[in-house]
From Swiss-Prot:
Name of the protein in its database record: Methionyl-tRNA formyltransferase
HAMAP family in the cross-refs: Formyl_trans
Annotated GO CC locations: cytosol
Keywords associated with the record: Protein biosynthesis, Transferase
Gene that specifies this protein: fmt
GO molecular function, one term: methionyl-tRNA formyltransferase activity
Source organism: Pseudomonas aeruginosa (strain ATCC 15692 / DSM 22644 / CIP 104116 / JCM 14847 / LMG 12228 / 1C / PRS 101 / PAO1)
Function: Attaches a formyl group to the free amino group of methionyl-tRNA(fMet). The formyl group appears to play a dual role in the initiator identity of N-formylmethionyl-tRNA by promoting its recognition by IF2 and preventing the misappropriation of this tRNA by the elongation apparatus.
Pfam family, one: Formyl_trans_C
Residues that coordinate or bind (6S)-5,6,7,8-tetrahydrofolate: S113, L114, L115, P116
Membrane among keywords: no
UniProt cross-references to InterPro entries, sorted A to Z: Fmt, Formyl_trans_C, Formyl_trans_C_sf, Formyl_transf_N, Formyl_transf_N_sf, Formyl_transferase-like_C_sf, GART_AS, Met-tRNA-FMT_C
Length: 314
């Protein structure tokens, strides 16, 4: 392997933690870990550390949690670490040019898409939602723009018709660390050079929010089926039946027509609902206060509740 580097790691969620875990198994020295401040989580809204912070503390690594890296004090603290390289994975803070210039080899980022497609916050879910045939991880040299830097390395994986946001996330979380380690070796040896992104091909992966997870039955069934997969396990698509919320965690394309949102049929195979085009069969649901269940299990005990002719989402 090439020379061991002094590395600062910056990341926050589980996807980033997988990268840190892999780097800890290399000869490189992690001199500090940057992550988002602890956030309230769960029913009790108790302050919880990020996945990256938890892993860093397990390994006795120094943890930094600045609110911003735009001020001179935070930048001086980073410079004092004398890092050769900063590895950034889903950190959640914008890095100004002054920060990008601090490490000797700059900053690299592992981004969960095949750039320049799906720059931005939610590339995994947007790829599934759009019906893309493939996704992957791009390791890039960072610059001040959002995911615009020269591409150092790409690895790809097909997106199957069964993939969810969760399953694709897990696959990319396994691919990304290997790509980062390979890119670090190339940078250290001076053999890896970036490919400029074609901005004309860029698309933007807007951040997910709970409001957009409400199913719009006027849309084509093929789009809603992809949305259900993309938004599982979060934020989870939802609708309502007789004013009660209904979470939808599994669906498949069905046949039938009717006014959008109308229940066409309920059976052990699922709840068939008319859409703007075609029909969607809901196969996995979660009722208020309950756990996610296959519709077959709900049908056994609640078939009257799902009688045909009712309209969802009213």
């Amino acid at each position: 392997m090439s020379q061991a580097l002094r590395i600062v790691f910056a990341g926050t969620p589980e996807f980033a933690a997988e990268h840190l875990k892999a780097l800890l198994d290399t000869p490189h020295r992690i001199v500090a870990v940057y992550t988002q401040p602890d956030r309230p989580a769960g029913r009790g809204q108790k302050l919880m550390p990020s996945a990256v912070k938890s892993l860093a503390l397990e390994h006795g690594l120094p943890v930094m949690q600045p609110q911003s890296l735009r001020n001179a004090e935070a930048q001086a603290e980073l410079a004092a670490l004398r890092a050769d390289l900063m590895v950034v994975v889903a950190y959640g803070l914008i890095l100004p040019q002054a920060v990008l210039d601090i490490p000797r080899l700059g900053c690299i980022n592992s981004h969960a898409s095949l750039l320049p497609r799906w720059r931005g916050a939610a590339p995994i879910q947007r790829a599934v939602e759009a019906g893309d045939a493939e996704s992957g991880v791009t390791v890039m040299q960072m610059e001040a723009g959002l995911d615009t830097g020269p591409m150092l390395l790409k690895v790809s994986t097909p997106i199957s018709a069964a993939d969810t946001g969760g399953s694709l996330h897990d696959r990319l979380a396994a691919l990304g660390p290997k790509a980062v380690i390979e890119a670090i070796a190339g940078l250290a040896a001076g053999t890896l050079h970036g490919e400029i992104q074609d901005d004309a091909l860029a698309t933007y992966a807007h951040k997910l929010n709970k409001d957009e997870a409400r199913l719009d039955w006027s849309r084509p069934a093929v789009e809603l089926e992809r949305q259900v997969r993309a938004f599982t396990p979060w934020p989870v698509c939802h609708t309502s039946l007789a004013d009660a919320p209904l979470k939808v965690l599994g669906a498949s394309l069905g046949q039938g027509s009717g006014a959008p949102g109308t229940i066409l049929e309920a059976s052990r195979d699922g709840l068939l609902v008319a859409c703007g085009e075609g029909a969607l069969r809901l196969t996995r649901l979660q009722l208020p206060g309950g756990k996610p269940l296959a519709f077959a299990d709900l049908y056994n005990s609640r078939r009257e509740q799902f009688a045909a002719g009712q309209v969802l989402g009213q």
